[in-house]
A protein has these predicted regions:
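A gly/ser-rich beta-alpha-beta helix-loop segment of oxidoreductase catalytic cores
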Residues: 160-180
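A glycine-rich, basic-preceded beta-loop-alpha segment at the flavin cofactor/substrate interface
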Residues: 255-289, 306-324
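A short core secondary-structure module
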Residues: 188-238
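Short Gly/Pro-enriched turn/cap motifs at secondary-structure boundaries
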Residues: 167-170, 198-203, 244-253
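Glycine- and acidic
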Residues: 64-69, 89-95, 113-118, 129-134, ...
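Amphipathic, small/basic residue-rich leader segments at the start of a protein or domain
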Residues: 1-127, 134-156, 170, 186
Length: 325
């Protein structure tokens, strides 16, 4: 019976694609593996030493005037404050001007900021999650690291990452933008047709990471597949003038469009990483999926709990606070 059911389900479920197989083989396991196998090795207690100045965070939280970060004609005020005060550098090593934090400290800071304003939390979260910074740290060439990481650390560069499009989102590689290897002016370049949307920080970013499916029909370089490259805002034919503001969500979000030509050395890590983009993305999702997003959820839970706790003390029914019932 079970074999029959198994074969029935097997016929209905699509086969694992190459990109899904790469995702399954990427990265490693954490304590979840130990829990599922029943062999948990408790590590010794870790003492965290906080690196980020408390007065810096206090200044942000006390001076923030609760006007939306976006849409706001004065949105640069707080974005510039975050950049200049190292809030975009929490993944970057000190040698590049960053303040690399422990997971614990990063989570605590994001939780506190998001509890004041979710939009401000998102603006802080994105540069410290999957994007140009983390991809450069793990896969960038030394030349790329020296060029971009100091600017990301001090806020000169505001990053965003363009993966999502009209027909791909959770299914990240479904109908993804295409790139074509070709020769132009005597050298090999990549022609990329961009149609990205729902890209957080896109309207204000000046350094974009873009993902696309590279095709090489003439076998000019002998490599194809999902590829990740860097593009600056000033790049010819790049368009970032459309904004998404659903429900006045409070953080910059928009599109990245245009038909552009990029050099092979704009691929993160250089030509050797052409076609490795999907693996790179899967191995760098942990900061956002495992730290940043849970921190924002933690903030929402704490704010809701705080509000409910205070409400039940002042809301009376049957001549007593409802919290005493």
């Amino acid at each position: 019976m079970y074999r029959t059911l198994f074969n029935l389900v097997k016929r209905k479920i699509p086969k694992i694609s190459d990109t899904e197989l790469i995702a399954l083989r990427s990265g490693n396991t954490s304590i979840d593996r130990d829990i599922l196998t029943g062999k948990i090795n408790y590590p010794e207690k870790i003492t965290y030493q906080n690196k980020f100045p408390k007065d810096n965070l206090s200044t942000l939280l006390t001076q923030y005037d609760h006007t939306p970060v976006y849409p706001n004609s004065n949105n640069n005020k707080w974005i510039n404050f975050l950049g200049k005060n190292k809030y975009f550098s929490f993944l970057i090593d000190e040698q590049y001007g960053g303040i690399k934090l422990s997971t614990n400290e990063l989570s605590n800071i994001l939780t506190k900021i998001t509890s004041v304003d979710p939009g401000l939390g998102v603006v802080t979260m994105v540069p410290n999650s999957l994007g140009p910074g983390e991809l450069l740290i793990h896969y960038g060439s030394e030349e790329q690291k020296n060029k971009y990481l100091p600017g990301l650390a001090d806020g000169s560069y505001i990053p965003c990452f363009g993966l999502t499009g009209p027909n791909n989102g959770s299914d990240a590689t479904g109908s993804i933008d295409k790139g074509l290897v070709m020769e132009k002016d005597g050298k090999k370049v990549i022609k990329v047709s961009l149609n990205k949307r729902y890209i957080t920080l896109a309207p204000v970013a000046n350094l974009m990471g873009i993902a696309f499916e590279l095709q090489d029909p003439d076998n000019l370089i002998g490599k194809e597949g999902v590829t990740v490259a860097l593009v600056e805002r000033s790049h010819p034919n790049l368009i970032q003038n459309t904004h998404h503001i659903p429900l006045n969500a409070g953080f910059p979000n928009g599109t990245i469009k245009g038909e552009i030509y990029i050099d092979l050395d704009q691929v993160i890590g250089g030509e050797k990483n052409i076609g490795n983009g999907w693996k790179m993305l899967m191995e760098c999702l942990s900061a956002g999926r495992g730290v940043s997003l849970p921190a924002t959820a933690n903030a929402s839970s704490k704010v809701a709990s705080f509000g409910m706790y205070n409400y039940i003390k002042v809301r009376d029914q049957f001549k007593m606070p409802i919290g005493n019932m």
